[in-house]
From Swiss-Prot:
Disulfide bonds: none annotated. Pathway: Amino-acid biosynthesis; L-methionine biosynthesis via salvage pathway; L-methionine from S-methyl-5-thio-alpha-D-ribose 1-phosphate: step 3/6; Amino-acid biosynthesis; L-methionine biosynthesis via salvage pathway; L-methionine from S-methyl-5-thio-alpha-D-ribose 1-phosphate: step 4/6. Its cofactor is Mg(2+). CDD domains: HAD_EP. It catalyses: 5-methylsulfanyl-2,3-dioxopentyl phosphate + H2O = 1,2-dihydroxy-5-(methylsulfanyl)pent-1-en-3-one + phosphate. This is Enolase-phosphatase E1. The lineage of its organism: Bacteria, Pseudomonadati, Pseudomonadota, Gammaproteobacteria, Pseudomonadales. Its EC number is 3.1.3.77. HAMAP family: Salvage_MtnC.
Amino acid sequence: MSIKVILTDIEGTTSAVSFVFDVLFPYAAKHLPDFVRQNAQRADVAEQLDAVRRDSNEPQADVERVVEILLAWIAEDRKATPLKALQGMVWEQGYQAGQLKGHVYPDAVEALQRWHQAGYQLFVYSSGSIQAQKLIFGCSEAGDLTPLFSGYFDTTSGPKREPQSYTNIQQAIGVEPQEILFLSDIVQELDAAQSAGLQTCGLAREGGELEGHVTVDSFTGIEPEAF
């Protein structure tokens, strides 16, 4: 059965890990406190602040305490859904102001465009919020790449190292598991996808091997028809 869908990770796969850790995270950490203070009454922001209180078991936390919790989560790289949502709102302001441009490797841009033209459906699955995913690709150094994608998945579909998450995504897309090729630089994510029946390809941009998976060092080496 041939590949119909290509599902890709972002960090370390389409985009440099350094962009996320050296550019996006520091930008969010710097601007998040004032953003939360200034927008705490906004419905979409208030909803996420309540989620922070719930997740931290501090239902009475005031805005300043919530800011403290968020900064602690950023420091420990916690994959908390409300943090990801709020970071996405801060990044959106940064992209709109022209202070941020999404990094996407040129080899990934070229391959994604080629696969889209060849009729493959392209989807993203990242621990960053769907909003943040759309910003990286929508305001990228290569322009607006969002027309290439059919959809986006984040941690609301489940953690990336659990097979059930990939089953959830496969069922949402509506194809057979073996018709999906999943791309990632993390072997535990590839293992989880493989356990759910997906085809896998590992990105080792610094070289090396992702054990148990076809491994390439750039998108140039990926041929979906070979899976």
